[in-house]
Amino acid sequence: MGKMRVGIGYDVHRFEEGKKLMLGGIEIPFEKGLKGHSDGDVLIHALIDGILGAAGLGDIGEHFPDTDVAYKEVDSKILLKRVLELVSEHYVVNNVDCIVVTERPKLSPYKDRIRTSLAELLGVSKERVNVKAKTEEGLGFTGREEGIKAYAVVLLEERY
């Protein structure tokens, strides 16, 4: 086993009318989506930050600035693919553990699909991907149903 490196990612986006809600690379049926320069996939953005952090390569904003029109409305899966290509020479993903915080929509019916999507995107078995859904019981930004936040812990393993 190679050396291990851990990273933590975080992201938050507010809800916006007229947009699709993308989480972990899949569309979740809901009356609002997430505002963002890209498609607003808060979970993939947190995952990207975790991967970059584990590899010591900064954060998502350094690689994909929201001032760059090239990333306007971009599919976050494309950004994740680019980050994986960036780290693949030296690292492989060992496992990821993610938390999505939202009052609504309830994510239990979609967690398995999100895990499958993330595993496929990361090129790992589904057993190496965990997704938890939490509420804040009416407290704060997410509790007031203003948006969604996500956290991701990523363990990278150094290639031999």
UniProtKB/Swiss-Prot annotation:
Enzyme class, spelled out: lyase
UniProt record similarity statement: Belongs to the IspF family.
NCBIfam families, per the entry: ispF
Species this chain originates from: Caldanaerobacter subterraneus subsp. tengcongensis (strain DSM 15242 / JCM 11007 / NBRC 100824 / MB4)
Assembly and interaction partners: Homotrimer.
Residues that coordinate or bind a divalent metal cation: 11, 13, 45
SUPFAM superfamilies recorded: IpsF-like
Cofactor(s) this protein cannot do without: a divalent metal cation
Pathway membership, UniProt: Isoprenoid biosynthesis; isopentenyl diphosphate biosynthesis via DXP pathway; isopentenyl diphosphate from 1-deoxy-D-xylulose 5-phosphate: step 4/6
Protein name: 2-C-methyl-D-erythritol 2,4-cyclodiphosphate synthase
Cofactor: record remark: Binds 1 divalent metal cation per subunit.
Annotated 4-CDP-2-C-methyl-D-erythritol 2-phosphate binding sites: 11-13, 37-38, 59-61, 64-68, 141, 144
Site (Transition state stabilizer): 37, 135
Record-level Gene Ontology MF annotations: 2-C-methyl-D-erythritol 2,4-cyclodiphosphate synthase activity; metal ion binding
GO annotation, biological process: isopentenyl diphosphate biosynthetic process, methylerythritol 4-phosphate pathway; terpenoid biosynthetic process
PROSITE patterns: ISPF
UniProt keyword Lyase present: yes
UniProt-listed Enzyme Commission number(s): 4.6.1.12
Keyword Transport set for record: no
Catalytic activities: 4-CDP-2-C-methyl-D-erythritol 2-phosphate = 2-C-methyl-D-erythritol 2,4-cyclic diphosphate + CMP
Cited function: Involved in the biosynthesis of isopentenyl diphosphate (IPP) and dimethylallyl diphosphate (DMAPP), two major building blocks of isoprenoid compounds. Catalyzes the conversion of 4-diphosphocytidyl-2-C-methyl-D-erythritol 2-phosphate (CDP-ME2P) to 2-C-methyl-D-erythritol 2,4-cyclodiphosphate (ME-CPP) with a corresponding release of cytidine 5-monophosphate (CMP).
Keywords per UniProt: Isoprene biosynthesis, Lyase, Metal-binding
